[in-house]
């Protein structure tokens, strides 16, 4: 009951944000052309906003599923008006590239977008793994294709987090012992969950809010591991031992952009 109440408050909050912002930057249009992110955890917010806009009397087309780099270009040229899946600061560069034609408007969730790397708790405890660098000595434990490197589910091409992950790889030399898997994220995570259920070790990037850490419970099934150095203003969260973990990613604001 308490969880349901929390969900209802969240829904009311989303609708109130739409009303407050009034979509002033696209209200001149006869039709609002919506986009949505190509990660499935963004579908829910997009649908809530679409229905709220329609209740306010707007005609809404879409949402059209798009990668971030595609959305911001399309929004700058007027091919699409709005999406509610902006992650700022990860997406700050896209805003700069739009030269003022696309801007964040309102908030879905302030500082609610955490990102980072997780491994199965069993392996973390067995090998004493605290950071991504600790993977190096035990990379074969996550090697699925026999190349000697740990296979880690990462971000598909075109996602903002792909650039942050690449920065970590460049700064820390992670490519020497980790292979980033950039296939469809949902399909890759379905494979991760299947492996975990079959007793195999898993290593993956994820973010919150996300169904992945609902299925694989934080502190029970999986734990965050630290990025010991990064130029990002890294978010910190408690892990299973209540210590603080430097995630290597900033805590993003999830915001509409139009």
Task: Indicate residue ranges for each PLM-predicted region.
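Ligand-binding pocket segment of bilobal, Venus flytrap-like solute-binding proteins
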Residues: 74, 80-84, 155-230
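A conserved helix-loop-strand patch within extracytoplasmic ligand-binding domains
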Residues: 102-154
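Short helix-initiation/N-cap motifs at beta->coil->alpha
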Residues: 39-40, 58-73, 180-191
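Short, polar/charged alpha-helical segment
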Residues: 40-59, 167-169
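N-terminal segment of the mature folded domain
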Residues: 69-121
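C-terminal lobe and pocket-closing loops
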Residues: 212-258
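Short, well-ordered beta-strand elements
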Residues: 30-41, 58-63, 149-153
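Sec/Tat signal peptide C-region and signal peptidase I cleavage site
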Residues: 23-29
